Amino acid sequence: MKVDPNKEKALAAVLSQIEKQFGKGSIMKLGEDRSMDVETISTGSLSLDVALGAGGLPMGRIVEIYGPESSGKTTLTLEVIAAAQREGKTCAFIDAEHALDPIYAKKLGVDIDNLLCSQPDTGEQALEICDALTRSGAVDVIVVDSVAALTPKAEIEGEIGDSHMGLAARMMSQAMRKLAGNLKQSNTLLIFINQIRMKIGVMFGNPETTTGGNALKFYASVRLDIRRTGAIKDGDEVVGNETRVKVVKNKVAAPFKQAEFQILYGQGINRTGELVDLGVAHKLIEKAGAWYSYKGDKIGQGRANAGKYLTENPAIAAEIDKTLRELLLSNPSALASSASDDESTEGNIDLETGEIF
């Protein structure tokens, strides 16, 4: 198709004028001078990284993680911070709930000496701190825990029982408009933890909703629904949770995938257990009876012992992790088949044998 030369000249002139006024890169053709691959940070769970499609949470975007109480929301964000710090990135934690446990964070691998932490007095203060950190361009990951605890100043200064209809939603809506562009410019990942509330009078459909209005739902590139699906027992003692995360919204890859993993109390995500399960599912690790083998060498009797071997041999664990990422991220449907197989195995797991009961 022939293009009018006068239109081409006019377009070139206006593009030149826009770039002169707003800076180079302020407007461009979609396929030109930019990386089409989104930079990501690992969530600490291999199966969740694969379910997200891009290999982790996307930089320069807003992410919402929500779920019931004690489902692993804060643990998941601390795992993301630990993964980011291992890559040399700077992280900040906005603790609006005033409930961050530094000892637990340290156990999960977070470098608490280099983690920026703020406990703001009001919701506006928390969001202003987020915006200032973002505009600095020096912070790579910001976590806000939680949206429900971002209390507007008017509500704090008022009395208990006063009506403040829509204040939090209006505050969040204004913050999202301001933050979204700045996050993209500075390539900062902003994670909001959110709580669940019940809508009154819902007869059909899901009565669950998240706090803070609808703005966050629209601006978030990724929304994760995290749930506790069972307990992990060592004998009679409960030592962790079976956890399922569903990717409810995803703007960087296909949504609606889900991942299942274990969160062990005081340790975080059971990475080696995940490697054993996915390794067996994709024929990287051989299983004969209760024995697990890798490249012909026995690595342990029972899932727990195989996981312990990988913990003691990080080079082998890293090799299996790398192979699985290459396999699953190039072929995400492979995980879907293994996840559907895993769905029938809900329940309690004996740490010694790895058996479901």
UniProtKB/Swiss-Prot annotation:
Give the stretches traversing the membrane.
none
Q: Please explain the role this protein plays, according to its UniProt record.
A: Can catalyze the hydrolysis of ATP in the presence of single-stranded DNA, the ATP-dependent uptake of single-stranded DNA by duplex DNA, and the ATP-dependent hybridization of homologous single-stranded DNAs. It interacts with LexA causing its activation and leading to its autocatalytic cleavage.
Q: Which residues bind ATP?
A: G67, P68, E69, S70, S71, G72, K73, T74
GO BP terms: namely: DNA recombination; DNA repair; SOS response
Single GO MF descriptor: damaged DNA binding
Listed A to Z, the keywords are: ATP-binding, Cytoplasm, DNA damage, DNA recombination, DNA repair, DNA-binding, Nucleotide-binding, SOS response
For this protein's source organism, the top of the classification is: Bacteria, Pseudomonadati, Pseudomonadota, Gammaproteobacteria, Alteromonadales
Listed HAMAP family: RecA (MF_00268)
The subcellular localization recorded is: Cytoplasm
- Please verify whether the record's keywords include Nucleotide-binding: yes
Please give the InterPro entries that the UniProt record associates with this protein.
Answer: AAA+_ATPase, DNA_recomb/repair_RecA, DNA_recomb/repair_RecA_CS, P-loop_NTPase, RecA-like_C, RecA-like_N, RecA_ATP-bd, RecA_C_sf
Region of interest called Disordered, as start-end residue ranges on this chain: 335-357
What broad class describes the main subcellular location of this protein? cytoplasm
Q: Per the record, a Pfam family? A: RecA_C
Report the domain of life of the source organism: Bacteria
Protein name as it appears in the record: Protein RecA
Q: Which Gene3D superfamilies match?
A: P-loop containing nucleotide triphosphate hydrolases
Q: Which GO cellular component terms, listed alphabetically, does the Swiss-Prot or TrEMBL entry include?
A: cytosol
The entry's family comment says: Belongs to the RecA family.
